[in-house]
């Protein structure tokens, strides 16, 4: 574990070097609570997670809680209580279930102090053409609060239906989570440059963010971790490395890290939209492409704790030995992967459940950092 901690600290330093001096960090997507999938984010853990990188504020909402029925009421109350106990760090959102009085629960939560709405069509099993969404968007427009909606895996195309809602309720600000990867090309066609629509950076693959920067105005992008699923320093490192490769200016990086989200929270007019800065193509050696491929294969195996994870990591590590230049980068990636392998091999022998969880999380962090380096090391 000590080797892993020291390696992670190196990338904390890299994040600090990439971050513009005195730039505010506002995390646009964190959770507090307990998910039915077993992930937990206590208030103390969340505040410590935010404090480690000097995050000033965060949009916070509950997970898919075991007691989510009826209407996420108890979970929303806990989110509000957490926000009150956070000394202004957490900006609370109310999570809704369209099957259980969504407008009534949103109204109740907003009256009690919520400052936004969270919708998760995959977890709550609804489509974006559901007629029950219209009154939710109407309420958000009337109350001048943002809606953050899941835009990641597990969804059919969503752009057309979201466009209708945004056109009907233009005063409702929309944040599409996970860079809108469920339908990114069409979402960008509909919303690139739109003053009331934003996309957050909470994804695993740097390729998703590079594609987003190619399609979306930089002023529409909000840094987000998706804690407890997203961890540091990978969450900030992926946002900053891809922004650098896409060619964002220092001022645009400041918008991404915090200024744009703070503007949403404080009710300020959005920044003037500028054209996308990203590139259509990236130059990458075959070696780094192969490393990325194997690490992408390993990621779901890590999540589900499959035995063959060690073998797939071995493929990535062996590829680092190819001699086609970029010696320093290959050595850095190899060190991360070797440390991840070492930790993964130790897991069965760790008896304490909490220690085993920490080691598992560090393994994922190391693999994520290695993949970010593999994708964002340009061969140009």
Indicate residue ranges for each PLM-predicted region.
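Mid-to-C-terminal alpha-helical segments outside catalytic/metal-binding sites
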Residues: 1-24, 28, 47-48, 56-57, ...
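Catalytic pocket-lining loop regions of alpha/beta-barrel enzymes
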Residues: 3-4, 8, 116, 130-222, ...
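Active-site gating/metal-coordination segments in enzymes
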Residues: 57, 70-146, 212, 353, ...
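Histidine-centered catalytic micro-motifs
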Residues: 25-35, 148-152, 179
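Ligand-binding grooves and catalytic loops that recognize ribose/phosphate and carbohydrate rings
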Residues: 130-136, 155, 194, 211-264
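Acidic-and-aromatic substrate-binding clefts and catalytic sites of carbohydrate-active enzymes
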Residues: 34-41, 66-72, 96-103, 124-129, ...
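Conserved, mostly hydrophobic/aromatic
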Residues: 29, 50, 79, 83, ...
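Divalent metal-dependent hydrolysis catalytic cores, especially in the metallo-beta-lactamase
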Residues: 28-31, 37-39, 44-68, 89-97, ...
